[in-house]
Curated annotation (Swiss-Prot):
Belongs to the universal ribosomal protein uL15 family. The keyword rRNA-binding applies. PROSITE patterns: RIBOSOMAL_L15. This is Large ribosomal subunit protein uL15. SUPFAM superfamilies: Ribosomal proteins L15p and L18e. GO terms for cellular component: cytosolic large ribosomal subunit. HAMAP family: Ribosomal_uL15. Part of the 50S ribosomal subunit. Coiled coil: none annotated. Gene3D superfamilies: 3.100.10.10. It comes from the Bacteria. GO terms for molecular function: rRNA binding; structural constituent of ribosome.
């Protein structure tokens, strides 16, 4: 058995195709028009046209306005509630997304809960949510409540 050396490597039979020689006579199979069709811009030298070229028509990338921002990829969506909306709830209770849906504060439990700090909180609550803003956390703790972050 021969040793494996770089100068003795060969491709498997049928793994490599021969290069197509274009424009070398009709008998070669790709003579005359070389597989580029009859006439027109796509059959001329210097083909093909550049990407985005639409035959002289104003291309799409120039027709569409330049926008000033990009949407965040994989952005997190939350069900948001302000601390002012929590004043209607019973003092001393534990509040989570299911409790808010039952009490009609939030309509849908589709996304995790995030508590925002708009308004004033007058009741002491233990709130379980996925996220809190800094102002919401300070207002809840100032009212004597606690914030628990859920995963």
């Amino acid at each position: 058995m021969t040793t494996l050396r770089l100068d003795s490597l060969k491709a498997n039979v049928g793994a490599r195709r021969r290069k197509m020689r274009k424009g070398r006579g009709i008998a070669a199979g790709q003579g005359a028009s070389c597989g580029f069709g009859m006439r027109g811009q796509k059959s001329r030298s210097g083909r093909p046209t550049r990407p985005g070229f639409e035959g002289g028509q104003m291309p799409l990338y120039r027709r569409v306005p330049k926008l000033k921002h990009f949407t965040t990829v994989n952005s997190k969506e939350f069900t948001v509630v302000n601390v002012a909306a929590l004043n209607e709830l019973k003092a001393g209770s534990t509040i989570n997304l299911d409790t808010l849906v039952k009490n009609g504060v939030v309509t849908s439990p589709k996304y995790p809960l995030k508590v925002l700090g708009n308004g004033e909180l007058k009741v002491k609550l233990t709130i379980q949510a996925a996220a809190f803003t800094a102002t919401a956390r300070s207002k809840i703790e100032a009212a004597g409540g606690t914030c628990e972050i859920l995963d």
